[in-house]
């Protein structure tokens, strides 16, 4: 007997991105028009994929409040789309980085130079008193820390960016059968969807709730009952180590229980780095 199975599609979007910049190449506005293919019906978080992407189109760039995003989601005869490896971030990152390359060509700037002019600066993560207050982006989310220019400079040094540019100029002559391309990208990852007011404001699963119970048994052993069910993440080891450290006992004295609704009836999901 032959069994066949299928799963979700991870990507299904048509994106139109427009950038505005001043004469020095600094971004002043971003407009995104998105058509999202939902597939034949909604899966777990099908509409959430373009919604998460909406927070990520600015990338790691210091974008002012001029951000215009609109998404139209449509049902089609295709397999449903849903969260798979990034859930909105790969689509948004691809779009903004391709748009940055196009802007660099239009302004006759090196693509890396354009990015350097627009990175969120390290000092923007600190308040006037020198406290690390984080950077609040145009959409209201707060990024706690970052030094994007330093990270990029280190990457470019290791990649010998200037040397590769010279090789590109030599190799990409008219009529060449092989041409050398250079790509660069950086991004924020929106993951770890823990209980939060942000998720609640999006009407997402009661704010991304989760449950856990710790019991000290008469035998002096400890039980940790978790609503997240592991499938390769190593929850049993990690939860036992965390509980043991906090309670001052050996991890061998901690039992982690999961995946049984008779024991742990309350649990949302294990995905998107929201457990480990």
Residue ranges and their predicted role:
Residues 1-3, 44-59, 83-118, 141, ...:
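Alpha-helical support elements that line or immediately flank enzyme active sites
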Residues 1-3, 28-33, 61-64, 111-120, ...:
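Beta-strand segments within the central parallel beta-sheet cores of soluble alpha/beta enzyme folds
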Residues 8-10, 21-54, 97, 106-153:
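Molybdopterin (Moco) oxidoreductase catalytic core of the xanthine/aldehyde oxidoreductase family
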Residues 14-98, 196-210, 270, 274-276:
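Glycine-rich loop/linker segments at domain edges
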Residues 3-8, 34-39, 48, 120-122, ...:
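Acidic, glycine-rich active-site loops and adjacent beta-strand->loop/helix elements
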Residues 1-23, 81-106, 133-162, 267-276:
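Glycine-rich and small/hydrophobic secondary-structure elements
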Residues 67-78, 214-218, 257-267:
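Flexible hinge/switch segments at interdomain interfaces of large molecular machines
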Residues 121-221:
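Helix-loop-helix junctions that connect adjacent transmembrane helices in secondary transporters/permeases
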């Amino acid at each position: 007997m032959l069994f066949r199975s299928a799963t979700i599609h991870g990507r299904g979007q048509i994106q139109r991105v427009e950038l505005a910049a001043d004469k020095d190449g600094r971004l002043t506005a971003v407009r995104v028009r998105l058509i999202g293919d939902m597939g034949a019906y909604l899966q777990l978080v099908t509409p959430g994929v373009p919604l998460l992407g909406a927070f990520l189109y600015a990338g790691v760039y210091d974008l002012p409040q001029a951000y215009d995003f609109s998404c139209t989601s449509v049902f089609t005869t295709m397999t449903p789309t849903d969260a798979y490896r990034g859930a909105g971030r790969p689509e948004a990152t691809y779009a903004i980085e391709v748009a940055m390359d196009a802007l660099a060509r239009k302004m006759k700037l090196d693509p890396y130079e354009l990015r350097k002019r627009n990175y969120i600066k390290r000092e923007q993560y600190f308040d006037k008193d020198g406290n690390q207050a984080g950077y609040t982006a145009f959409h209201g989310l707060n990024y706690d820390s970052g030094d994007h220019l330093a990270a990029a400079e280190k990457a470019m040094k290791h990649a010998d960016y200037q040397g590769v540019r010279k090789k590109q100029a030599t190799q990409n002559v008219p009529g060449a059968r092989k041409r050398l391309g250079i790509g660069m990208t950086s991004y924020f990852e929106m993951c770890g969807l823990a209980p939060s007011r942000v998720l609640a404001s999006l009407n997402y699963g009661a704010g991304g709730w989760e449950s856990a119970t710790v019991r000290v048994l008469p035998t002096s052993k400890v039980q940790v009952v978790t609503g997240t069910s592991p499938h390769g993440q190593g929850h049993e080891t990690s939860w036992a180590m965390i509980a043991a450290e906090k309670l001052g006992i050996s991890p061998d004295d901690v039992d982690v229980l999961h995946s049984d609704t008779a024991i742990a009836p309350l649990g949302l999901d294990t995905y998107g780095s929201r457990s480990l």
